Design a protein with these regions (language model features):
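Extended, well-ordered protein cores
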Residues: 210-222
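Charged/polar, solvent-exposed surface patches and flexible loops
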Residues: 90, 94, 98-101, 174, ...
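N-terminal low-structure segments adjacent to metalloprotease catalytic domains
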Residues: 5-8, 13-152
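Generic alpha-helical secondary structure signal
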Residues: 90, 129, 167-170, 174, ...
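Active-site recognition of the HExxH zinc-binding catalytic motif
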Residues: 219-234
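Auxiliary, metal-adjacent structural segments of Zn-dependent hydrolase domains
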Residues: 145-209
Length: 234
């Protein structure tokens, strides 16, 4: 089934074990007839919200998550700059979790949109005052960076995959099924393709990974890198 998810702004792939791989429209839900059959759902994106959160992390000098590298083409705080306070770091991490996997990390209080970030940043109405004050001066630069990075992802995926972006995932699942001798269990995976300064793939949530854009464009290397992720979930 050909890809039909215009401009790759969000790639959503699903499979019933009796169907060919294909793209699920952004608001599509599974057909009730497939409820009892194993199926998988993969969403690939370079989410502007995720990019904004990481840009703010870098601009504020926040170190968590410690294993995530810096973003390319975005200023890194000077070594002698004052580090973010533990309070801001904690509040940012909670905001990060809500951004990456909002269903798994619901806010305990109402959320409020932050001025200057359009609808891309929402923080708890109470308990995030320090973070709110810290990020406000960086709104314009973080938004500009995130939107530019997202546009480059869209252009790159359109030009390099030729409409076959799903094949890397389908191949990894098929190889997993051959190795273990069974169908893959039903699972969900979110993939964020990001302009990291280091090449690799990192878990950023229970059902979410971040992959460097350079690795994603390398068909052979990405196929090898995504297989352990598929095996973990399937």
């Amino acid at each position: 089934m050909p890809l039909a998810c215009g401009h790759f702004q969000r790639l959503m792939i699903a499979r019933s074990i009796d169907a060919h791989p294909g793209v699920v429209p952004q608001r599509c839900t599974y057909d009730g007839r497939m409820v009892d059959k194993p199926q998988w759902l993969i969403r690939e994106d370079a989410s502007v919200s995720v990019l904004v959160a990481l840009a703010l992390r870098q601009l504020l000098g926040i170190r968590v998550p410690e294993d995530l590298p810096a973003l390319r083409d975005l200023a890194v705080r000077a070594p002698d700059a004052v580090e973010a306070s533990p309070v801001i770091e904690k509040q940012w991490h909670e905001y990060w979790d809500m951004t990456v996997e909002p269903r798994a990390h619901p806010a305990g209080v109402p959320l409020e949109l932050i001025d200057g970030f359009d609808t891309l940043v929402a923080l708890p109405a109470t308990g995030a005052e320090e973070l709110r004050a810290a990020i406000t001066p960086f709104a314009a630069s973080a938004l500009r960076y995130a939107r530019g990075a997202h546009s480059r992802y869209v252009d790159a995926m359109t030009s390099t995959t030729g409409g076959d972006a799903y094949r890397a995932y389908a191949s990894a699942i098929a190889e997993f099924e051959r190795e273990v001798g069974r169908r893959a269990h039903s699972f969900e995976l979110n993939v964020q393709v990001l302009p990291f300064s280091q090449r690799g793939i990192w878990w950023i949530g229970a059902l979410s990974v971040a992959v460097s854009d350079g690795l994603r464009r390398d068909v052979v290397a990405f196929d090898s890198a995504i297989r352990p992720v598929i095996a973990e979930l399937a």
